[in-house]
Amino acid sequence: MIKILLFAGLAEQAGTQAIEIDMEQATTDEIKASLKEQYGLESIDTAMIAVNESYVKENTSVSSGDTVAIIPPVSGG
């Protein structure tokens, strides 16, 4: 299982802050594409990704037991 954590507007759009996917391996790009399709998360393309509390680059490999945080851009003043 790979645990996905969603924050801010992404969590609101998905209706949940945490999702578990039953995969042994995936890339961060595959996870984002899957969530975009399943939950209609259009703004996921601009989100930052962290795996096990460390920011990663696009298309990073993720394994079962990892936690992936998807953090949308924050704006405000």
Swiss-Prot record:
Keyword terms, alphabetized? Molybdenum cofactor biosynthesis, Nucleotide-binding, Phosphoprotein
State any GO BP term from the record. Answer: Mo-molybdopterin cofactor biosynthetic process
Pathways involved: Cofactor biosynthesis; molybdopterin biosynthesis
Q: How is it modified after translation?
A: C-terminal thiocarboxylation occurs in 2 steps, it is first acyl-adenylated (-COAMP) by MoeB, then thiocarboxylated (-COSH) by IscS.
Q: Which residues carry this modification: 1-thioglycine?
A: G77
Report a single Gene Ontology molecular function: nucleotide binding
Q: Name one GO cellular component term.
A: molybdopterin adenylyltransferase complex
Q: Which InterPro entries match?
A: Beta-grasp_dom_sf, MOCS2A, Mopterin_synth/thiamin_S_b, ThiS/MoaD-like
One Pfam family it belongs to: ThiS
Instruction: According to the UniProt record, list the residues that bear Glycyl adenylate.
Output: G77
Family label:
Belongs to the MoaD family.
Subunit field text: Heterotetramer of 2 MoaD subunits and 2 MoaE subunits. Forms a stable heterotetrameric complex of 2 MoaD and 2 MoeB during adenylation of MoaD by MoeB. During catalysis MoaD shuttles between the two heterotetrameric complexes.
* Functional summary from the UniProt entry: Involved in sulfur transfer in the conversion of molybdopterin precursor Z to molybdopterin.
- Protein name (Swiss-Prot/TrEMBL): Molybdopterin synthase sulfur carrier subunit
According to its UniProt entry, this protein's organism is Bacillus subtilis (strain 168)
